[in-house]
């Protein structure tokens, strides 16, 4: 049961970090004129 919880937490952290990295890397290229987030 503990290994299942570790696997779930690892998957969630992986997808969250992948989403954050993809959002930060693609946001300036999609919106070059938007500087209000900085």
Curated annotation (Swiss-Prot):
<dbReference type="InterPro" id="IPR037271">
    <property type="entry name" value="PSII_PsbI_sf"/>
</dbReference>
<keyword id="KW-1133">Transmembrane helix</keyword>
<keyword id="KW-0602">Photosynthesis</keyword>
<protein>
    <recommendedName>
        <fullName>Photosystem II reaction center protein I</fullName>
    </recommendedName>
</protein>
<keyword id="KW-0793">Thylakoid</keyword>
<keyword id="KW-0604">Photosystem II</keyword>
<dbReference type="GO" id="GO:0009535">
    <property type="term" value="C:chloroplast thylakoid membrane"/>
</dbReference>
<comment type="subunit">
    <text>PSII is composed of 1 copy each of membrane proteins PsbA, PsbB, PsbC, PsbD, PsbE, PsbF, PsbH, PsbI, PsbJ, PsbK, PsbL, PsbM, PsbT, PsbX, PsbY, PsbZ, Psb30/Ycf12, at least 3 peripheral proteins of the oxygen-evolving complex and a large number of cofactors. It forms dimeric complexes.</text>
</comment>
<dbReference type="GO" id="GO:0015979">
    <property type="term" value="P:photosynthesis"/>
</dbReference>
<feature type="transmembrane region" description="Helical">
    <location>
        <begin position="6"/>
        <end position="26"/>
    </location>
</feature>
<keyword id="KW-0934">Plastid</keyword>
<keyword id="KW-0150">Chloroplast</keyword>
<comment type="function">
    <text>One of the components of the core complex of photosystem II (PSII), required for its stability and/or assembly. PSII is a light-driven water:plastoquinone oxidoreductase that uses light energy to abstract electrons from H(2)O, generating O(2) and a proton gradient subsequently used for ATP formation. It consists of a core antenna complex that captures photons, and an electron transfer chain that converts photonic excitation into a charge separation.</text>
</comment>
<keyword id="KW-0674">Reaction center</keyword>
<keyword id="KW-0812">Transmembrane</keyword>
<dbReference type="InterPro" id="IPR003686">
    <property type="entry name" value="PSII_PsbI"/>
</dbReference>
<dbReference type="Pfam" id="PF02532">
    <property type="entry name" value="PsbI"/>
</dbReference>
<comment type="similarity">
    <text>Belongs to the PsbI family.</text>
</comment>
<dbReference type="GO" id="GO:0009539">
    <property type="term" value="C:photosystem II reaction center"/>
</dbReference>
<keyword id="KW-0472">Membrane</keyword>
